[in-house]
Amino acid sequence: FFVFLFIGVFSLNSAQASFVPEVRPGPGVTAQKWLSDYHPPLKGTNFDTPIFFLDGAKNGATALLIGGTHPREIGPYTAAVVAIENAAVKEGRLIVIPALNASGYGISDLSTKIPRVHEIKGRSGARSLYYGDRRIALADWGKPDDKKFIHMSGFEIDDPEEARNINRNYPGRADGSWAEQVTFAVMELI
């Protein structure tokens, strides 16, 4: 886990590196995978992100907690990190993705002047909470935005930037845009 934390700190200092959330997995974490384990084309990109599994001693229902779909909404990211570090599942399984839109954490929110990094002190020591843009970074997207966003269902939104909004792209496509590939991977996980 120490290597994982080092990579997370390093990623903020390198424009080319992917964002990896600063997480200190608690004793309830039974496994860790990556989103690319469910859709291999994401491996090595700024769209790959860690997934944590917390399994109970007894079989039961499975719950999925996703944080960081919109990196400028700090609450879900914080809730996901708190769950990974503190939850203990007795029955069933909890799957946690703390920072689904890893690309969005790599850039400042384009509509506010809120700092990207918020330093806090807690019981486990000093750490950082991150804040980014709600959309995939244009540099990661790899092309200019189209004139409008057209969902795979045919629904149209006049704001072209919505194509880079992960939440608008479910259920995703294996061969679609980056946002569609991220949501496809989540659906494969489910």
Residues covered by each model-derived region:
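Sec-dependent N-terminal signal peptides
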Residues: 2-8
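Short glycine- and acidic-rich boundary segments immediately preceding or forming the N-terminal edge
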Residues: 8-49
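Short beta-strand-to-loop junctions in surface cap/lid or active-site-entrance loops
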Residues: 50-59
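Short N-terminal binding/cap micro-motifs at the start of the first secondary-structure element
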Residues: 60, 72-75
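Alpha/beta-hydrolase fold active-site loops
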Residues: 61-64, 94
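Histidine-centered catalytic micro-motifs
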Residues: 64-72
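Active-site/substrate-binding loop(s) of hydrolase catalytic cores
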Residues: 74-79, 90-190
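Histidine-anchored nucleotide/phosphate-binding helix
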Residues: 80-85
